[in-house]
Structures are given as C-alpha cells and as structure tokens.
Amino acid sequence: MKGGDELARKWSWYFRNLNENNKLLLINFKKALLYRGIKEETVFEYQKDMKNLMEYLQKLNIRTLDVTNRDIREYLDTLNVSAPRKIRIICVLNLFYSHNAKKGYCENPMKDIDTSELREQLKKGDSNDK
C-alpha cells in the first residue's frame, strides 16, 4: 500500500528526535488507536500532537509518564493555537494518558483539565486556527 509506506517513512523521520521510551509509547498508542478503528492519517495527526508534548517535556527533563496536571497546564499555556485546535490537543492527550493509565503505567494528569472556557470561545466565534 503506497500511502502506508509513505506514512511510515514520514513517521520515522518526523519522530527521530524523540528518545526511545517516547518512540515506544507512540508505537503502542498508534496500535491502540488503529485497533479502535481510527484512520491512519488521523492517528498520525494525533501522534504529532503527542510528539510536540514529548519534545517539550524532554527539554524539561520530565518523563512523559511522570507528567503532572500542572505540567500539562503549563504546556497548554505555551500553545499559540485556536480554541478548536487546543480542544483537539486536549482530547488527544486525554486519549494517550487514559490508555496508559488503564494499563497501569501512570496516573491520568488530564482528569482535571477543563475545556469549558475554550468551548465558550467557540460559541463566540473564535474558530480561526492561529
């Protein structure tokens, strides 16, 4: 399948700066998402969102599975994206951490992240991606 080969090449290049633990976490996350029936292109977009968080955490010497709610909030504050994009990122992070929490690898730091303020922005019409 040509599309799958191209995506695999893009994946390996795009995630080259991540440490081995983070690469393994992303591979397992990808498998879980594909098992749920999520399209490969969507999975790649979700992985890009996770990669951005992982790179941020690596710079701070914080292990991805040791992240706290505060770390997540600080990361989200650094993002210069629209409300819809930030909501999607929060959903992706919640999927990732819920998956790993169910496996017993970590606590879910996303459980107290509230998107109501962002959703209110959507109602007011702030839907342009930055």
Locate each region found by the language model:
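Short, Lys/Arg-enriched N-terminal segments with co-localized hydrophobic residues
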Residues: 1-6
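A detector for short, charged/polar N-terminal pre-domain segments
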Residues: 13-23
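N-terminal core-binding DNA-recognition domain of tyrosine recombinases/integrases
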Residues: 9-14, 27-124
